[in-house]
């Protein structure tokens, strides 16, 4: 979005901040990162009325403790947009992005809390599966452009097809 708004410096700074913040949990990504990249702030409930009397009023966000599979597609899509806009991805960054794609191959079949941050039992969400497909598709695009190593590209291609089949037969 920042690139499309004509803010390439801010887009680059955000991309590198995200890669830096996620370094400690690599290849896993957290749902939320504080601005300083530190540990999440716990969620707490306040004894106040919210908008139009709604309750509970929460400070913080418990989603930080959830699994949301869509975040991997967001990151790899961002990396591809950055690279296509002329951003340089060094070898180490390419290896890290490939590691994220490898992780997606291992975890996409799991249920998650989805972008809706469901607070109960994790479920299979179409959006989450689609974003796992996006993650692997964008990893393949980055691979084809020489930005990430191709060592596991055949696995990514196989899993892209498996995710598509899952979406077409089990999702709605």
Name every feature range the model reports, one short phrase each:
Residues 1-172:
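Acidic, mature catalytic/reactive cores of soluble proteins
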């Amino acid at each position: 979005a920042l690139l499309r708004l004509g803010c390439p410096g801010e887009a680059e700074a955000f991309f590198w901040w995200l890669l830096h913040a996620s370094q400690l949990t690599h290849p896993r990504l957290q749902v939320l990162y504080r601005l300083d990249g530190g540990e999440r702030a716990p969620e707490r409930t306040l004894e106040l009325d919210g908008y139009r009397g709604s309750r509970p009023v929460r400070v913080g966000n418990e989603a930080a403790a959830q699994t949301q599979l869509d975040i991997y597609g967001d990151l790899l899509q961002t990396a591809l947009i950055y690279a296509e806009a002329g951003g340089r991805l060094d070898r180490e960054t390419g290896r890290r992005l490939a590691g994220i794609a490898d992780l997606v191959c291992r975890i996409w079949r799991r249920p998650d809390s989805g972008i809706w941050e469901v607070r109960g039992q994790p479920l299979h969400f179409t959006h989450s599966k689609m974003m796992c497909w996006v993650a692997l598709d964008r990893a393949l695009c980055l691979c084809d452009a020489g930005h990430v190593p191709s060592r596991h590209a055949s696995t990514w291609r196989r899993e892209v097809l498996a995710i598509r089949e899952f979406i077409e037969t089990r999702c709605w």
